[in-house]
């Protein structure tokens, strides 16, 4: 079967078909079960992180090395010529002359698409502002499939910062292709953006607002937690919502046995440490799946056959 992702940019989940997502998912699962160390042999990957990252940067670099490739790059845009005023377009032109693919994280929405326009090699978006995070979405799909045995018709609850959280935007855009049903738990000021709910409506996916994490845990197959970002509130407004969207183990008392709690990490206080021992907690395993998801992306983008 032809590889539908060979030499393709990976910029946004909305650019990918269900066939392409399924190809990525199955390749990640295959590489997890049967690792290969030759798929990036002789390949050099540019790791271009203009803002801080722990899991995404290290898991991409781990993926490259486990596949037999090598990495060059930077972990802070302040130490590059961007500090001198070099445009992102010129940076992409230059680095694409050195490497076989570019993995880029940038604080500005749309930055990955700009880089792709000027790069001579595939660009993989490792997060652009509040916009998209497609490799996180793939590891989420791998984790959901691994824990539920399917993606079709699942009940997905999302909680916390749904307005600015790029992970939940991308995940909605992916899971709508499998007819999932959604529930949202957030303060009104951090509700899911209209453009996402409109896409769900166009895909005939039902969604609802729920008032508490207890309700969400009882209803859902997957409870996807995110951090409510204190810096986006004044002190008085934050005081009104503080603790309301923090998950504790006692809140999972009526959860279905198959419920899994996910989180893109890092967490602060939105998941209490007592949840870690609950059978529903799966966020650390989810983070581990980042390596296999990113191995799949790199392998498919840089090989005609995998």
Curated annotation (Swiss-Prot):
Record has Transferase as a keyword: yes
Residue numbers binding carbamoyl phosphate: 55-56, 105, 133, 136, 265-266
GO BP annotation list: 'de novo' pyrimidine nucleobase biosynthetic process; 'de novo' UMP biosynthetic process; amino acid metabolic process
Keywords: Pyrimidine biosynthesis, Transferase
Domain of life of the source: Bacteria
Any GO CC annotation of this UniProt entry: cytosol
Gene3D superfamilies: Aspartate/ornithine carbamoyltransferase
Quaternary assembly: Heterododecamer (2C3:3R2) of six catalytic PyrB chains organized as two trimers (C3), and six regulatory PyrI chains organized as three dimers (R2).
Alphabetical list of PANTHER family matching this protein: ASPARTATE CARBAMOYLTRANSFERASE, ORNITHINE CARBAMOYLTRANSFERASE, MITOCHONDRIAL
Family the entry assigns: Belongs to the aspartate/ornithine carbamoyltransferase superfamily. ATCase family.
Protein name, UniProt field: Aspartate carbamoyltransferase catalytic subunit
Organism expressing this protein natively: Neisseria gonorrhoeae (strain NCCP11945)
């Amino acid at each position: 079967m032809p590889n539908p992702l060979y030499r393709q940019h990976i910029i946004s989940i909305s650019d990918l078909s269900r066939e392409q997502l399924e190809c990525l998912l199955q390749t990640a699962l295959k590489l997890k079960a049967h690792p290969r160390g030759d798929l990036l042999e002789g390949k050099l990957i540019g790791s271009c992180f203009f803002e801080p990252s722990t899991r995404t940067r290290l898991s991409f670099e781990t993926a490259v090395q486990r596949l037999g490739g090598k990495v060059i790059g930077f972990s802070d845009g302040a130490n590059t010529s961007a500090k001198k005023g070099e445009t992102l377009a010129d940076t992409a032109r230059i680095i694409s002359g050195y490497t076989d693919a570019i993995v880029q994280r940038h604080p500005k929405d749309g930055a990955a698409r700009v880089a792709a326009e000027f790069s001579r090699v595939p660009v993989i978006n490792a997060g652009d502002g509040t916009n998209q995070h497609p490799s996180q979405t793939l590891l989420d799909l791998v984790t959901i499939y691994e824990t539920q045995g399917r993606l079709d018709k699942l009940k997905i609850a999302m909680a916390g910062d749904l307005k600015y959280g790029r992970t939940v935007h991308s995940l909605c855009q992916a899971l709508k292709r499998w007819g999932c049903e959604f529930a949202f738990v957030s303060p009104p000021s951090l509700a899911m953006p209209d453009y996402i709910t409109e896409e769900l409506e166009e895909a005939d996916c039902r969604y609802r607002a729920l008032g508490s994490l207890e309700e969400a845990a009882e209803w859902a197959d997957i409870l996807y937690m995110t951090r409510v970002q204190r810096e986006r509130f004044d002190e008085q407004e934050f005081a009104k919502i503080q603790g309301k969207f923090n998950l504790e183990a006692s809140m999972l008392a009526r959860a279905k046995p198959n419920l899994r709690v996910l989180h893109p990490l890092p967490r602060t206080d939105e998941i209490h440490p007592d949840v870690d021992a609950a059978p529903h907690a799966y966020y650390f395993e989810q983070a581990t799946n980042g390596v296999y998801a990113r191995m799949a992306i790199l392998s498919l983008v840089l090989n005609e056959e995998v």
